[in-house]
């Protein structure tokens, strides 16, 4: 019997044996070698856990989530084969999100809330800047910290909590410094930069560079659930000029016993971020270590293989990029077209529809699991029930509801993005040492 690579099982546990995947010379067969468990990570005392709570008043918007992901990484939809599909009426959607409660008082243990909005589109966290409170997005796919502030127009500020530098005792201007985050569909935030104290539930950086935009795009203005963004990527992504600044995570690392961020983002259940330590009660089995390539500033890992459902064969990617970014700021999974086509080939009546912007299917369809490789040694299993992201429309012929998939095409770009759909399936630790990711099944 042929040995199999180590795979996260149906309960998202890790199997007891760990193996390497290696390609035998001249053959398209996978052989296996035994691999020892990674060195255990020291459990720490100096740490901060940021608890999240579920936001019940969300508006599912799959196409909106895909558009946002394309915009973030500058992906121009092209090369996707869309069906005409006249038998489809999309739901109308209100892109203005429900305003999230600003109940953000941390308790004496340093635990604060984190609120998912719009069908878990964003995981938001209470943040204090210069003693003023905000709700912001923790984003491992970028490296700038910026906040809505008094320099914006009255229309832009409406519905947001606003940072006032004059009310902060610690604020100072970063002389002649500017930041400019620009996304693919002209979404942007730019302006001057200051230095202030940033605190996330007790995780405190006293001299953090904070962008104070003088202008932001409409998409940020309409997103009234969020007052800004905390970038947790590598410093290479930081946009401050003339001198790049360190990200919040880089600065915070010096104050932690271990430079780690653990993300437990489970679907429909309380989850958390935790800086500085790894809670063994949050995962099952052993953590396994995946090397990270941070040359582009992302938490990027090798990902060259996949399989769908009960297919016994592992497929090696033959077209497209062989790596993926682990990004808490993106909702969906954006993968090579080879993967997305193979996946929806196994979903009855699934098709790529222009009016929806991506793959849709009958909401009652049975969805297969998707397996993607992380590094050379492991497969992560994303259960099929995580692939039904949101209702998107109706069949005008049958009246049946149609749903939008949680995995979509990266449109042939040079990036695969593993967003929150993956994080709902597995427990992930971002480790600045190495750097590396450590992964396991959710407890």
Curated annotation (Swiss-Prot):
Localization of this protein: Secreted
Glycosylation sites: 180, 293, 364, 388
Listed InterPro entries: Aspartic_peptidase_A1, Aspartic_peptidase_AS, Aspergillopepsin-like_cat_dom, PEPTIDASE_A1, Peptidase_aspartic_dom_sf
GO molecular-function term, one example from the UniProt record: aspartic-type endopeptidase activity
Superkingdom of origin: Eukaryota
GO cellular component, one term: extracellular region
Annotated transmembrane regions: none
Ranges of residues in domain Peptidase A1: 123-440
EC number, UniProt record: 3.4.23.-
Pfam families reported in the protein's UniProt record: Asp
Annotated signal sequence range: 1-36
Cystine connections: 363-403
Gene3D superfamilies: Acid Proteases
UniProt keyword list: Aspartyl protease, Disulfide bond, Glycoprotein, Hydrolase, Protease, Secreted, Signal, Virulence, Zymogen
Biological role: Secreted aspartic endopeptidase that allows assimilation of proteinaceous substrates. The scissile peptide bond is attacked by a nucleophilic water molecule activated by two aspartic residues in the active site. Shows a broad primary substrate specificity. Favors hydrophobic residues at the P1 and P1' positions.
Protein name as it appears in the record: Aspartic protease PEP3
Taxonomic path: Eukaryota, Fungi, Dikarya, Ascomycota, Pezizomycotina
């Amino acid at each position: 019997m042929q040995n199999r690579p180590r795979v996260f099982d149906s309960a998202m546990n890790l199997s007891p044996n760990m193996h390497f995947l290696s390609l035998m010379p001249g053959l398209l067969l996978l052989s296996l070698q035994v691999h020892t468990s990674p060195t255990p990570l020291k459990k720490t005392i100096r740490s901060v856990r940021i608890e999240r709570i579920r936001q019940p008043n969300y508006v599912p918007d799959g196409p909106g989530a895909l558009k946002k992901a394309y915009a973030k990484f500058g992906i121009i939809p092209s090369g996707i084969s869309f069906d005409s599909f006249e038998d489809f009426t999309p739901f109308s959607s209100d892109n203005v999100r429900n305003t999230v409660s600003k109940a953000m008082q941390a308790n004496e243990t340093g635990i604060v809330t984190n609120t998912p909005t719009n069908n878990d589109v964003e995981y938001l966290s209470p943040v204090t800047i210069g003693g003023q409170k905000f709700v912001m997005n923790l984003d491992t796919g970028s490296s700038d910290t910026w906040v809505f502030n008094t320099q914006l127009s009255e229309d832009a500020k409406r519905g947001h909590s606003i940072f006032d530098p004059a009310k902060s005792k610690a604020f100072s201007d970063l002389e002649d410094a500017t930041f400019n985050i620009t996304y693919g569909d002209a979404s942007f935030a730019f302006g001057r930069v200051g230095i202030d104290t940033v605190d996330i539930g007790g995780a405190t950086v006293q001299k953090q560079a904070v962008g104070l935009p003088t202008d932001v795009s409409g998409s940020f203005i309409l997103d009234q659930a969020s007052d800004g963004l905390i970038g947790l990527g590598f410093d290479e992504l930081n946009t401050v000029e003339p001198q790049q600044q360190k990200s919040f995570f880089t600065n915070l690392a010096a104050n932690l016993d271990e430079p780690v961020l653990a993300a437990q983002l489970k679907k429909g259940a309380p989850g958390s971020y935790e800086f500085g330590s790894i809670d063994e009660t949050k995962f099952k089995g052993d953590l396994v270590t995946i090397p990270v390539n941070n040359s582009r500033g992302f938490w990027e890992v090798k990902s060259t293989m996949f399989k769908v459902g009960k297919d016994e064969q592992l497929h090696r990617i033959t077209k497209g990029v062989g790596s993926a970014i682990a990004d808490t700021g993106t909702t969906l999974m954006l993968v090579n077209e080879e993967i997305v086509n193979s996946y929806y080939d196994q979903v009855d009546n699934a098709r790529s529809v222009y009016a929806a912007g991506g793959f849709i299917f009958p909401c009652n369809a049975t969805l297969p699991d998707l397996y993607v490789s992380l590094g050379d040694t492991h497969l992560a299993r994303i259960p099929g029930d995580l692939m039904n992201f949101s209702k998107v429309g109706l069949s005008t012929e049958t009246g049946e509801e149609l749903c939008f998939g949680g995995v979509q095409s990266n449109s042939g770009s040079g990036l695969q993005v593993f967003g929150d759909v993956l994080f709902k399936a597995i427990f992930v630790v971002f480790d600045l040492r190495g750097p590396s990711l450590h992964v396991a099944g959710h407890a």
